[in-house]
Every structure is written in structure tokens, then in C-alpha cells.
């Protein structure tokens, strides 16, 4: 089972202004998130009565499965039969491998911001947008358990509590220039962050020993993960034709200060988990999300939308949308001893496609909508 609770409070206000800035917004936001996962497991065993005939009140009769070549087979109330004739006692701690499947992650994020909205002109060109700053404080923690094979029976399940706190100052500038003729140029400059996945912050550790080599290994989450951080530059051009048709081109550049990737570190000290196990050494492979530092991400995107009714009324309601993106990345792996590293050289960002394209044909009319899409990456 998974329980994910999010609570939030936001207080904000605005002050009208005259001149280049039309309004000043001030606010503070409190976000509290708690995610808890439990995955108890167990075997279903025959009860003390042993093998027996299922009672008539639990039988449904025969079902014809001739279409599958199985003929007629009996059917019954399976949940009822399990409850009456079998035992099932799921647990999170009955085996060492189950312990790492339960964890709790908590995040407390406080964000204060100030934003000045722009609705003015630069020369004869109308410009809209905003400039502002956010100050964000994050307190993240995780609680889980691990199996200590050296402890006395009944005391082998031990807690893990870990986490970190950090503060980010995030300035941003966003501008949109109206060039006339339904043309817009957008410009953005900002320091950005992206939070880690909640499951990546789990403190749980799954430990095991290779029976052939005696080498230990472990994997889990990392409650001390920093977010993705980047200095970002975005610029785009948009041209509209009527209400729905448009073409656009956008380019972006991100100077990555930190990123997150799954890494396997060799010769990792696992002495905390090896006592009582069959391991012949305390050092093995540990796999978990880690932060990398330094790199770039850049690219461009082309997009177009064309309602075919603009060509001929016979195709009214039909349309086509297309887009293509082209990406380049370059990161430096933090730990040269990791199996995902190439020494001091750079690698591409794992999981990022160099080229992605989308093509969609659609029909929209009278409240009815149908789409056929293709995506390549």
C-alpha cells in the first residue's frame, strides 16, 4: 500500500504599480508532503483441516471454457475459500529481503517569492512578462529499516533515519515581445531546480551476498540527494494564423550545476550490513541515485499546427500537429570509480534522446474528438 499526503498553505498579495512594472506580487508558500510505502508479503498455506472439499455455499458451478479448448471446469469463491480453509499472515519483517520494501519520506518546503509583472513597451514594441526571485528552503528526511544479521533474533530489524536540508535562491526573468502580425518572441533567463523522485529519497537498503564469490552488494535510495540545479536560457519565436494554426521554433541552453543519475559504486564499504552474513569481504557494489556536478544541456524544438479546414471546408474539423526536438548533453560523472563513469571524460545524460518527433492527426467537431499519434525517439 502507498499513502501519499500533501498539505499546503499559500499567502499572497499584490500591489498595483504605475510605469514599466504594472504590479508587484509577494507571497509565501508552505508545502508538507509525507509518502509512506508498505509491501508486506507471505505464503498462503492450507489450514489445520488439511485438504478438504470446498463447501457448496462457496461453489459457483461449472464454467464452459470450450473456446479455449479446456472444456468445462468448476469455479468457486476464491477469497471466501482462502479465508475459510487457508492461512495468510503477510509481514514486512519475516524475511530480510522484505524489510527494504517499506519506507517513509517526508518533505517540508517553504518558498518565499517576489515578482514584478511587466505590461509596457520597449520603443514601439509591446512587452509583457515578469521578473522576480524565489527563496526556497527544503527539509527532507526518510525513515526505513535494514536487516542486521549479527544481532540477536528478534532484534535484527534496525532503523535507518537520514536526510538533509538546503536553501536555493532562484531569480527569473520572462519576457514576451509582440512583433505585430500575430508574431511573438519569448525570452527567459532563470536559475531552476527540479525535485528528486520521492522513491529516490527512500532510506531503505536491500542487502545481499553473491553465493559464488562471497561478495556483498546493496541498493536503495539516497535521502541526501540534492535537486537538479541549472542556469537556464530559453528563447522562442511563434507565428499564429487564425485561432488554431501556428508555427514555432524554440532553443534552450542549461548549464547544469547538479543532476541525478543511478550509479553503481564499486569497493563501497558495506561493513554495516555484512556481520552475520556469508560475505567474505566488507566491500562490494552499492547502487543508488547520486548527484553529479557539471554539465550542459541544449537543444531546439520545431512545432506546427494546421487545421485542414483552412485549406478546404471539406476537411473542416480535421487537422495535423507535428513537432521535433533535437537535444545535446554533456555531463561529468562525479565518481571516477563508478561503473557508469568513463574516467575523466564526459558522457551524455542517461535517458535523454538526441532526437524526438511527434505527429498527430485529429478530428474535432460537434463535441466529438478522435486522434491518431505517432512518436519516435
Predicted regions: what is each one?
Residues 5, 28-36, 133-141, 189-195, ...:
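Transmembrane beta-strands of outer-membrane beta-barrel pores
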Residues 37-43, 95, 141-148, 198-204, ...:
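Outer-membrane beta-barrel translocator domains and adjoining extracellular loop/strand segments
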Residues 16-24, 39, 121-127, 180-182, ...:
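Short loop/turn motifs that connect adjacent beta-strands in outer-membrane beta-barrel proteins
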Residues 1, 40-101, 266-290, 373:
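Flexible glycine-rich, low-complexity coil/linker segments exposed to the extracellular/periplasmic environment
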Residues 253-255, 272-377:
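Gram-negative outer-membrane beta-barrel transporters
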Residues 101-105, 164, 193-256, 278-306, ...:
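Outer-membrane beta-barrel signature, preferentially recognizing the C-terminal barrel domain
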Residues 1, 12, 97-103, 154-162, ...:
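Extracellular loop and loop/strand-boundary signature of outer-membrane beta-barrel proteins
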Residues 11-15, 112-118, 173-177, 225, ...:
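Residues on the lipid-exposed face of transmembrane beta-strands in outer-membrane beta-barrel proteins
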Amino acid at each position: 500500500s502507498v499513502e501519499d499526503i500533501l498539505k499546503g498553505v499559500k499567502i499572497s498579495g499584490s500591489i498595483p504599480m504605475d510605469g514599466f512594472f504594472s504590479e508587484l506580487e509577494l507571497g509565501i508558500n508552505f508545502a508538507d508532503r509525507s509518502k509512506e510505502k508498505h509491501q508486506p508479503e507471505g505464503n498462503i498455506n492450507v489450514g489445520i483441516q488439511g485438504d478438504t472439499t470446498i463447501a457448496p455455499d462457496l461453489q459457483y458451478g461449472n464454467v464452459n471454457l470450450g473456446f479455449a479448448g479446456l472444456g468445462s471446469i468448476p469455479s468457486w469463491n476464491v477469497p471466501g475459500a482462502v479465508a475459510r480453509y487457508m492461512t495468510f499472515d503477510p509481514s514486512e519483517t519475516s524475511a530480510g529481503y522484505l524489510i527494504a520494501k517499506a519506507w517513509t519520506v517526508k518533505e517540508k518546503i517553504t518558498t518565499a517569492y517576489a515578482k514584478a509583472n511587466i505590461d509596457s513597451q520597449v520603443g514601439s514594441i509591446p512587452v509583457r512578462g515578469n521578473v522576480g526571485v524565489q527563496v526556497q528552503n527544503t527539509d527532507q528526511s526518510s525513515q526505513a529499516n535494514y536487516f542486521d544479521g549479527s544481532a540477536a533474533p528478534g532484534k535484527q530489524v534496525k532503523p535507518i533515519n537520514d536526510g538533509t536540508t538546503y536553501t536555493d535562491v532562484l531569480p527569473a526573468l520572462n519576457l514576451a515581445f509582440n512583433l505585430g502580425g500575430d508574431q511573438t518572441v519569448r525570452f527567459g533567463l532563470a536559475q531552476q531546480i527540479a525535485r528528486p523522485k520521492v522513491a529516490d529519497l527512500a532510506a531503505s537498503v536491500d542487502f545481499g551476498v553473491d553465493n559464488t564469490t562471497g561478495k556483498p552488494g546493496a541498493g536503495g535510495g539516497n535521502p541526501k540527494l540534492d535537486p537538479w540545479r541549472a542556469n537556464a536560457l530559453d528563447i522562442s519565436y511563434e507565428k499564429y494564423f487564425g485561432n488554431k494554426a501556428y508555427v514555432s521554433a524554440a532553443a534552450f541552453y542549461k548549464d547544469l550545476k547538479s543532476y541525478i543519475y543511478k550509479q553503481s559504486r564499486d569497493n563501497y564499504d558495506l561493513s554495516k550490513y555484512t556481520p552475520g552474513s556469508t560475505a567474505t569481504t566488507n566491500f562490494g557494489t552499492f547502487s543508488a541515485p547520486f548527484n553529479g556536478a557539471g554539465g550542459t544541456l541544449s537543444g531546439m524544438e520545431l512545432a506546427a499546427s494546421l487545421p485542414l479546414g483552412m485549406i478546404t471546408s471539406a476537411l473542416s474539423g480535421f487537422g495535423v500537429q507535428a513537432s521535433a526536438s533535437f537535444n545535446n548533453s554533456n555531463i561529468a560523472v562525479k565518481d571516477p570509480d563508478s561503473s557508469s563513469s568513463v574516467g575523466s571524460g564526459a558522457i551524455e545524460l542517461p535517458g535523454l534522446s538526441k532526437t524526438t518527433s511527434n505527429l498527430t492527426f485529429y478530428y474535432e467537431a460537434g463535441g466529438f474528438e478522435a486522434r491518431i499519434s505517432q512518436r519516435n525517439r
